Amino acid sequence: LLMTGFVAFISSLSLMAQHKVEMVPFGDMDQWVDRQIKESGIIGGNTKNVYEIAPTAVIQGDQVYKNMGGSPWGTSNVMAKVAGITKTNTSVFPEKRGEGYCARLDTRMESVKVLGLVNITVLAAGSIFTGTVHEPIKGTKNPQKMLQCGVPFTKKPVALQFDYKVKMSDRENRIRATGFSKITDV
């Protein structure tokens, strides 16, 4: 899924049906933070790029991320530290489109297997939302607890406007992969 162009709220200006399109901060998807996080050596020790929608910056190391520069956007990109192992997921990333960028949202399987200590496979769906993620992720139980969805608004939007393009899976069934359970069709 690609979210392109801009994300805007259409706010009511008066009791009459007049509307004004206003950009949500960073809604054009042209500015990204590139977090460069080294995963644990026991799973390869590779440095991974974990992206966030916020003022352009590069952050090196496994620092916990907090929304920067007034950005209201959270993503499903995360850093996890489970049983002392640092692992990342990037399923939302910038993709060039025209003169700027769009947000590409992918769904993928993420696996971590370590010498009988950890054996996790999860379905990681790309998503963006207003809010934050509480890092680091420390397990797969109650993932909604790690999300703080929503941000305060002082206006009353009546609509959300955005461009998108989607490529659907060719699988007949959806799958469920939550971490410690068996992967099943749903």
Please name every model-derived segment.
Residues L1-M23:
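Bacterial Sec-dependent N-terminal signal peptides
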Residues Q18-Q161, R176-G179, I183-V186:
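Aromatic (Trp/Tyr/Phe) and Gly/Pro-enriched flexible surface segments
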Residues V166-R174:
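Extended, low-complexity, turn-rich repeat/linker tracts enriched in Gly/Pro/Ser/Thr and Asp/Glu
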